[in-house]
Amino acid sequence: ARPADRHYSLHAAHTSTWTFVPADNVWEAVQHWRRTNGIEAAGGVHKAAGRFVFDLWGGRYGESADALRRAFRYGLTDAMVMWHNWQRWGYDYRLPDIYPPNPQLGTLDEMRDLIAACEQAGVPIALHDNYIDFYPDAEGFSYEENIAFHRDGTPVKAWLNEGRGARSYRYRADRIEPYLKRNLHLIREGLAPTSYFIDVWSSAPPYDYWTADGRFVDRLFTRSVWGGLFAWIRDLLGGDAPQISESGHDQLIGWLDGAQTNHLRVGPPVGEGRYRWAVWNWPCADAERTPWFDAAHHDRFILHGAGYSSRYQGGLDARLHGMYSDDYMTTEVLTGHPGMVSQPFGRDVVRKYWLLQDLMRALALRTIEGVEYVDGDLHRQHVRWSGGARVWVNRGEADWQVAGATLPQYGFLARVPTEGGLVEASISRHNGVIVEMARSADRLYVNGRRVVDPALPIEPRVDAFKDRGDRTIELTLEWQADVPIPEGYRAFLHFCDQQGEILFQASQDPSALAPGRQGTIGATATATVPGEVAVGETLELRAGMYAPSGGQRLALRGPDDGTRRIRLGTIRLEGEGDRLAAITWKPHVPEPDPLLARQNPEARPVDFGPIETAGACRLTRQGDALVITPLPDERAPGFTATLRWDQLPWKLPRPARVESLSETGESLGRSRLEFDGDAVAVECSPRAFAHRLTGD
């Protein structure tokens, strides 16, 4: 595109058919194209549609099975699981030699139990596989027989596993089948997953290639091989096992059932980290995410979430733009994509399901009838769905008054008529507080967003700093641990550049933070600043704790950088020219946390009609009883839920008692209820799984 020359061109490979659809706007055009293109959904689409997604890249088999069972007890069963890291030699290494499962993550029986836990809950589980990257140390590797070549006779390089120093090469499409079928027969007999995930095939386009002896193979052949193998796996596993891939282009619709979205933003790289690149860096006056792909394919190709969290946030603060943020969830609602989470269990996991899942189930397999940019504003979008469903999304900075609601930035309102009644969900501003609500015929979820600190009460700080000369520094640290140091975690001290990338690390004695230690813990750390760091540069020290077994970081107290690292301060290399005079230290000065503007720090009770509370809980009917289930988190403060009995969506007899229940259904105690008119206050304890209100 050359706008200054008024020149725009489209390019396609090989023999192509172009279809032009004239219409008053693109949304009318895409409706016509959707109705007439003849594309049919693959066999597993009906099974994948609408399902919440556990997208799991780390963790051990046994512990993850236990965590998923907890999630299922909280009702998170209209779902599917993507299990990515399990391959025999580790993730993305020595492919295609992937079976049996990696013993470093647990036993074969534990892996089978993980799959059984999902099957018992009616939750499909997919295992991650890859037939793009062939590693030279894998059995059967041969440039001549298996690897694609460029026109000039050089092999096509594929993924570089930097952590293990291993370069892979791209498969010839005509040589994938024997390796894939060998693996799938082993996996079906040994593990029996109920879904399957193949990486890259719907993020990279089908490719042309040459063989080692100079034969040309076009991309249409590659596409037919990929598609045919997806269909073969679905038949082999049985039960219309959904086939899932990465990102989700439209070239495999009819064979492939869905993909994990990567819905990037348009704009220049900003923020920090290695995923600053994850944007469409196109200069333009304005831009916004919009449901273009789903307008064409929502009912025949199931996209999950809004993207892997690091790619979606693209260098921005994960708390404000990551997978559990209002920004991310509003994009899921805008597109009608099932919610996606990165953990098997947790407060945010349950919260996201309770807020979004009834809505996503109601939108599953519907079609988009139109998208309006209200008053010409790209950031205020109104999406009309088949069957009378309506969604309003505000991604602009100013509040938007619409359909009786006040939508803040990254707020939404959705109303979907169903046979069982109206399904409604929202993130809205209510009396100055941003809150969450979702209701359907069977459930009512509310969240007054009282602040619940996800951090462990462990906070690091620097007590003293010393420049020891010769580019060596010494830090005296104090770790205030109000709870015991957890098992399996180790401290880290990163010195980072302005993008948050690690340039070098300081070391401290790991025994100082041995598991079980508590109180004020002193430690000394040292570091040598590399010669590549020039005089005049400033670097930031960020500290935290991580699990060497899987890389997960703990959330700690202090000024978090959005990646679970606490900002402690900066060092600066002072001097003139290339001559270093000294290394100086400046403590970090915390700024107001922008996340608090989206929460309820004063814990003001919010009136949701049938219930008033600053807490977060779901109401369900159980016969003549009412069950209140708080969001899980034993470290969260208790809260009061004031029920207005006559305004509940169900006609229930007035209760006389409340019984607190454990996760396994055991009674934790009973107490009498006292009504004030039609209102009754219930004290919700974080130590209880649920509170059941009954008449006896």
Give residue spans per PLM region.
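Extracellular/lumen-exposed scaffold segments
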Residues: 454-602
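Aromatic-lined carbohydrate-binding/catalytic grooves of carbohydrate-active enzymes
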Residues: 38-179, 189-195, 203-211
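Extended low-complexity, serine/threonine- and proline-enriched intrinsically disordered segments
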Residues: 490-500, 643-647, 655-663
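Short solvent-exposed strand-capping/beta-turn motif centered on an Asx-Ser/Thr pair
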Residues: 397, 480-486, 498, 633, ...
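Active-site-proximal substrate-binding groove within the catalytic cores of carbohydrate-active enzymes
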Residues: 1-20, 52-62, 151-154, 159, ...
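Proteolytic cleavage junctions
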Residues: 669-696
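Short, aromatic- and glycine-rich surface loops/edge beta-strands on solvent-exposed regions
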Residues: 537-545, 658, 689-696
